[in-house]
Amino acid sequence: MARKKLAKLILMTLGILMWGMVSSRAATAASGTLYVVSTGPGDPQHITVKALETIKKADLVLCSSESAKHLQEILKGKKVEDPWKELWWHQGKVWMKDLATFKPEERAKIVAEKKRQRDEYVKRLKTLLAQGKNIALLDRGDPTVYSRSFWLLEGLDPDQVEIIPGMGAMTAAMAALKKCSTGAGARFVAQTAPFGFFGKTDREDLARDLSHYPGTLVFYMGLTEIDNLVNTLQKYNPADLPVAVVYYAGYDDKEKIVKGNLGNILDQLASEKEKFMGIIIVGQCLEGPTFTLGEETKEKPAISKGPDQGK
């Protein structure tokens, strides 16, 4: 009798364990995924097949109203929502970008409020994911470079997120220029922006240090700081170092290239009105040979020695 009771107890225990495992797997299988989807730079034709397939299976698409209009044919019939209208703007400004323009006490309030709004929004996304819903968060260009999407994802478990890569603005810009960013003996390619390039205590540290080596500098969101960028680079590099600005990279009807060098690029850009949609490229790759075949580039290095070198 005791053996029968023990056997029955063991069977019940095994049954409970198996039920728990099946339930756990079922719950995991039912969980949705949030996809950060690159839609490429410029025209919709740059979007990848995988991105299209991901959008197709999404129950909810998150993107700016501008992107929704730009991709209206692709998003036809989808439920679309703009998360950035509330999360990204404050008094008509992009709060994270213009945070330094606010007084310290107001700055702290803005950060706290935006984090609260973000956390509330993420809480809602978690609920949808738990219900098995798939969400596509669209990102123009390369979603892994200066992407606001990652700020929104901070409250999510990495296992709930998948990144669908795609073409970035730098690739589109170099394609427009018909140049290779690693050409002319470049030892590095740096993707940066003014708020990262200019240090807080020593604003010229990178400009000074990188001028020791041949390389290519690619600046995002740099048009509003183009004067500071050029003037700083001029201190450590020769005036004939090539510079190019590609406006609206990837847009067939808007793409425009302005070429020059550190000595004349500001004059070349004086009549241009666009102050955001442009990629700035600096380096000998714009004019030098793609392959140096091991030859030294001492006569004209990509980022060469300037008058204030070593100070």
Which ranges hold each PLM region?
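Bacterial N-terminal signal peptides that target proteins for export
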Residues: 1-11
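Bacterial N-terminal signal peptides
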Residues: 10-21
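Class I S-adenosyl-L-methionine
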Residues: 26-45, 49-164
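A contiguous loop/helix-start segment that scaffolds small-molecule binding in enzyme catalytic cores
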Residues: 29-36, 106-114, 130-135, 148, ...
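Short, well-ordered beta-strand core segments
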Residues: 60-61, 180, 217
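Alpha-helix capping/helix-boundary segments
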Residues: 66-70, 144, 169, 225, ...
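A short acidic, often aromatic-flanked loop/helix-cap motif at beta-alpha or helix-coil junctions
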Residues: 84-92, 169-170, 197-199, 251-253
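Class I SAM-dependent methyltransferase SAM-binding "motif I" and its flanking Rossmann-like core
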Residues: 137-213, 256
